[in-house]
Amino acid sequence: MTYPNLLDRFLTYVKVNTRSDEHSTTTPSTQSQVDFATNVLIPEMKRVGLQNVYYLPNGFAIGTLPANDPSLTRKIGFISHMDTADFNAEGVNPQVIENYDGGVIELGNSGFKLDPADFKSLEKYPGQTLITTDGTTLLGADDKSGIAEIMTAIEYLTAHPEIKHCEIRVGFGPDEEIGVGANKFDAEDFDVDFAYTVDGGPLGELQYETFSAAGAELHFQGRNVHPGTAKGQMVNALQLAIDFHNQLPENDRPELTEGYQGFYHLMDVTGSVEEARASYIIRDFEKDAFEARKASMQSIADKMNEELGSNRVTLNLTDQYYNMKEVIEKDMTPITVAKAVMEDLGITPIIEPIRGGTDGSKISFMGIPTPNIFAGGENMHGRFEYVSLQTMERAVDTIIGIVAYKG
């Protein structure tokens, strides 16, 4: 189905800079997200028909569309995030490419281009309307496509009361891209049987498995002496960092793994002879494998300290989120419903693990099973990001189908 306000709504959203800031200590991490929620989203939530609309101190804008059929007793939530990734989001100037011809798309005057030779996903979209960047910013389809789709679904349901639906709760939240947005999510206040994050990629994505995730911060304490007289005295902290890294499995890196394979990812290393620091992220799907990866890092640190005769390696491990499969597989209703709706719409569900996490990873462990469904974005988090309007329309169809489902 086509929705006349969907494209303009999406274009309005992406032109607002809502980039999050991992170094901030506030919630949300940037004032622009507060402004976007209070000045743009909340007024529109009221206009499209949501009731009891409010903004919480945790950064979530919340609203409800009451059920219009007493036989549909479920309460279902839909959640998308306001923030965009760590890439330029100031001055987003989207290009709308109607009836895409399957060829190269020049991204404004930036000198960058979307070429099917480099981005095979473009081969799916001839004849469709694509929204791209101008090459100087990201687009923000992650996750403003999700926000626009949820808002459009509510607007359509309000305008078409003949479509019977259950109670719907909507939540637009902050700081998903920096991994803290759902930390303060109020599951008791949201009060639904299950929910969906509308934060996926291509048409048909339906995901209920995520990584389990941890962060590792390492400090290496060296001893700096003049290199000319260093033998037997110098301890080079940078060399310690190298030695630590070289003891990790050589092939367990993001660029060498796929599917259900986990990894260690060195994010940053800084320092000097005197001291050095390294930051890693640890990812795996199975709980035992996840715990084994953390234990392996601790074992390497302990072994190095034993060999050095002092505590020159300090490791701090912090769990970040867990594989939501552990919660959702106990009651697969949200997957069964979404899968049936997609199939009824002629959409082939793509049920694959997310090699990442969503807000649903945390919200599921708060008591609300929250799998992820497609929102349409491709090449997210950078200048090559784009989205198909037709895929966004199908996401709206899917949301409407889920809340009207009687199975």
From Swiss-Prot:
GO molecular function: metallopeptidase activity; tripeptide aminopeptidase activity; zinc ion binding
Keyword Transcription: no
Main location group: cytoplasm
Residues at the catalytic site: D83, E176 (proton acceptor)
Cofactors (names): Zn(2+)
Transmembrane segments: none
Enzyme superclass (EC): hydrolase
Chain positions recorded as Zn(2+) 2 binding sites: D142, E177, H381
Gene3D superfamilies: 3.30.70.360, Zn peptidases
Listed EC numbers: 3.4.11.4
Protein's GO biological process: peptide catabolic process; proteolysis
The organism's place on the tree of life at top rank: Bacteria
Reaction catalysis annotation: Release of the N-terminal residue from a tripeptide
Compartment list: Cytoplasm
Chain segments annotated as coiled-coil in the UniProt record: none
Function: Cleaves the N-terminal amino acid of tripeptides.
Name recorded for this polypeptide: Peptidase T
Name of the encoding gene: pepT
